[in-house]
């Protein structure tokens, strides 16, 4: 199973990706985690990424795709993967499709977790208190939701046109949402 998990901040992508990893016995690949690991390892891509981030700039699609290509070449992804945090825009979706086609591992499905904006803000506010996440302050949350709406939401249409999209209600208990994802994937 080769899967992309989409959804706005606070929709439960990371939580459900971790649960799907255990359910399907395939790795959960987070581009944020990849970036941090490459920087920590001091790899050539990590050095480039660190320089970019030190300037306060966003890491380029080229660097992210290079990291993804290296990760997808590892043995543990032979039976599939769950990709979380990428693609974030249509250009990245096209690049990902090209990469996966090149390595002979096209996506099986893209799951979009749907959660109302008001509930997202509540969830994120609760997470900020519980985890002390600096990027979960109200102003940052509004900005992240707007960025998602402007940049990432068009990715939904991209995959819908290709017949890969499954929309799942992301509201409910962790088990309820996991069950809905399984049903959407025909499992």
Swiss-Prot record:
It catalyses: AMP + ATP = 2 ADP. Residues 30-59 are annotated as: NMP. Pathway: Purine metabolism; AMP biosynthesis via salvage pathway; AMP from ADP: step 1/1. GO terms for cellular component: cytoplasm. AMP binds at residues 31, 36, 57-59, 85-88, 92, 133, 144. Keywords: ATP-binding, Cytoplasm, Kinase, Nucleotide biosynthesis, Nucleotide-binding, Transferase. It comes from the Bacteria. ATP binds at residues 10-15, 127, 172. Belongs to the adenylate kinase family. Consists of three domains, a large central CORE domain and two small peripheral domains, NMPbind and LID, which undergo movements during catalysis. The LID domain closes over the site of phosphoryl transfer upon ATP binding. Assembling and dissambling the active center during each catalytic cycle provides an effective means to prevent ATP hydrolysis. Monomer. PANTHER family: NUCLEOTIDE KINASE (PTHR23359). This is Adenylate kinase.
